[in-house]
Design a protein with these regions (language model features):
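Domain-level signature for soluble enzymes in the chorismate/prephenate branch of the shikimate pathway
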Residues: 1-97
Length: 97
């Protein structure tokens, strides 16, 4: 194997490790969403909080900008995470019988 191919294999291994960590973090975020649902239910709060969502998007877009990440990546990524969080929280809501 050439040096370039070994370098490519190492870089792919780094991608694989990063991807695994991203998935672990998404799973952790979903676990927090489930706990958040319990708190919101106990306190009679709505699952969807547009003001909090807007503040979070502004924060992550600013963070992304500082990291030289394009907004075209950051915003859709976090909109997807927010939608998933809301879905997870709604799944925790007791069903009416």
């Amino acid at each position: 194997m050439s040096e370039q191919r070994e370098g490519l294999a190492e870089l792919r291994a780094r991608f694989d490790a990063i991807d695994s960590e991203l998935l672990r973090l998404v799973a952790a975020r979903r676990a927090v969403s489930r706990r958040m649902a319990a708190v919101k239910l106990a306190e009679g709060l709505p699952f969807h909080d547009p003001a909090r969502e807007a503040a979070l998007l502004a924060r992550v877009q600013a963070d992304g900008s500082r990291l030289n990440l394009p907004d075209a990546l950051v915003k859709p990524l976090f909109l997807l995470l927010l939608a998933d969080s809301l879905q997870v929280q709604r799944q925790e809501e007791p069903t009416a019988t």
